[in-house]
Amino acid sequence: MSTPLDHIRNFSIVAHIDHGKSTLADRLIQSTGGLELRDMKEQVLDSMDIERERGITIKAQTVRLKYRANNGEDYILNLIDTPGHVDFAYEVSRSLAACEGSLLVVDASQGVEAQTLANVYQAIDNNHEIVVVLNKVDLPAAEPERIREQVEEVIGIDASGAVLISAKTGLGIPDVLEAIVHQLPPPREGDATAPLKAMLVDSWYDAYLGVIVLVRIIDGVLKKGQTIRMMGTGAKYLVERTGVFTPARINVDELGPGEFGFFTGSIKEVADTRVGDTITEDKRPTAQALPGFKPAQPVVFCGLFPVDAADFEDLRAAVGKLRLNDASFSYEMETSAALGFGYRCGFLGLLHLEIIQERLEREFNLDLIATAPSVVYRLLLNDGSVKELHNPADMPDVVKISAIEEPWIRATILTPDDYLGGILKLCQDRRGIQADLSYVGKRAMLTYDLPLNEVVFDFYDRLKSISKGYASFDYHLTDYREGDLVKMSILVNEEPVDALSMLVHRTAAEKRGRQMCEKLKELIPHHLFKIPIQAAIGGKVIARETISALRKDVTAKCYGGDVSRKRKLLDKQKEGKKRMRQFGKVDIPQEAFIQALKMGD
């Protein structure tokens, strides 16, 4: 039996990291009886260990809640919990496209942050009704009135009816439920008799059921036994079970218009289910597909290599399994003279990279080395063709290239006034171009255009340390612009080390090269011969350090004696060292790679 449309509410919770949206989701589940108290744990919807530990949401999750409103009517509330971090913005955009309304959660002590803005504008673009919720009003530092004004001033939406809550203590939760029912709209359309039309919101892999596909039904009915077709890929599947999450997985007979639920159907790989695809019945297809999403494009690339070459097979299996669940993560095989076999992987951003690396190390027990992260450059070649470059080591000969373009981002930074000077200097040092500076209460809102390759290294860490952790940062890619970029190679004993080569801006090349050489000098152990470490652009060396040789005192056995005798022994030693240097191999310890790639400023 499908629920009537006007008794369904589909909504998501939009907030900056740590403003308490997963805790609010917990309270909503608890107060509508979605889980028994004994099953309650904090952040019920953050199912990965790493999500709970870092206190962040990575995968969007959904829950169906039954709620009896004060007017005595029963409603079905479908809550979609979304990530707040900029790297997972595409998870947010998918979730928002599947809903009609949003709860905007703002911390009553901290106010509007950079990602609050980014996510709220996405919700407004999707024509969402927005209910403002001020959380953490029980904190001594909470200033609900000031924050209410701030929301109206910065975002431009009416916050006079904002709901004041404390998700931790449960204060004000009934008011939130009433606001969802009375202020958010029901699904806009939906005809149970029309051909099936459903939107694929997410999918993940289950060891027993194969791929579980999360869908939002627009028209028609999805039930067991139907043969469905994915309109994007043309693939057909037989539906084996349909169900909903409450958050426990519960099978139901059918899913009707406006509802959220899941189905399984012997789908082997998550890559077969494209997010944003339209699902329809094979026998009676819908005439018009839904406007799809752009697939998530990897922004940052880096090489992942096992510390022990024998673990390569395990790494191969592990990246394959992770790809099952994370369609935005891409990889291809790569070999490096210094590090052996590994994979060149693409990520949505640095947090995504860190999380994938941590999941590989944790869930699959691997020890990994990550090479320096790089972005996707566009090379305009002399013959008029355009080539994308993911790995600086693969750069063609300079004479073939007419120009190099690099990706630029538009960054929004919110910071307390006291730290503004330091942050402006940081952005300036990173070749930033200031686009705007305005004030939100006592905080400055900066808009900067920055090259992504300057942000990838350690911009976020520097920003946090300059602002003592108070600044927040959000960005989106804007375009590609031509830059004066050069490939810097690192040579150890006159042999280039491919894993350490990088593309840098010509003005920063010397500083970067010097830092790298100094760092390697500390990290590579002394050998019996002298080792030069050089940073070079093409054939021109721009920085050099030398590791001195270990030497034996060959003149120790001459008691006083004749100077020509000593000379002879020293010259003989010198000759040997020279020959040794010609044929000697320098062993660079793995530790040195790991440390050298952690560049500081």
From Swiss-Prot:
Its EC number is 3.6.5.n1. It is found in: Cell inner membrane. One of its GO terms (biological process) is positive regulation of translation. CDD domains: EF4_II, EF4_III, LepA, lepA_C. GTP binds at D18, H19, G20, K21, S22, T23, N135, K136, V137, D138. InterPro entries: EF-4, EFG_III/V, EFG_V-like, EFTu-like_2, G_TR_CS, LepA_C_sf, LepA_CTD, LepA_IV. The gene is lepA. Disulfide bonds: none annotated. It catalyses: GTP + H2O = GDP + phosphate + H(+). GO terms for molecular function: GTP binding; GTPase activity; guanosine tetraphosphate binding; ribosome binding; translation elongation factor activity. Residues 6-188 form the tr-type G domain. PANTHER family: TRANSLATION FACTOR GUF1 HOMOLOG, CHLOROPLASTIC, TRANSLATION FACTOR GUF1-RELATED. Required for accurate and efficient protein synthesis under certain stress conditions. May act as a fidelity factor of the translation reaction, by catalyzing a one-codon backward translocation of tRNAs on improperly translocated ribosomes. Back-translocation proceeds from a post-translocation (POST) complex to a pre-translocation (PRE) complex, thus giving elongation factor G a second chance to translocate the tRNAs correctly. Binds to ribosomes in a GTP-dependent manner. Belongs to the TRAFAC class translation factor GTPase superfamily. Classic translation factor GTPase family. LepA subfamily. This is Elongation factor 4. It is a peripheral membrane protein. It is an enzyme of class 3 (hydrolase). GO terms for cellular component: plasma membrane. Keywords: Cell inner membrane, Cell membrane, GTP-binding, Hydrolase, Membrane, Nucleotide-binding, Protein biosynthesis. Its main location: membrane. HAMAP family: LepA. It holds the Pfam family GTP_EFTU.
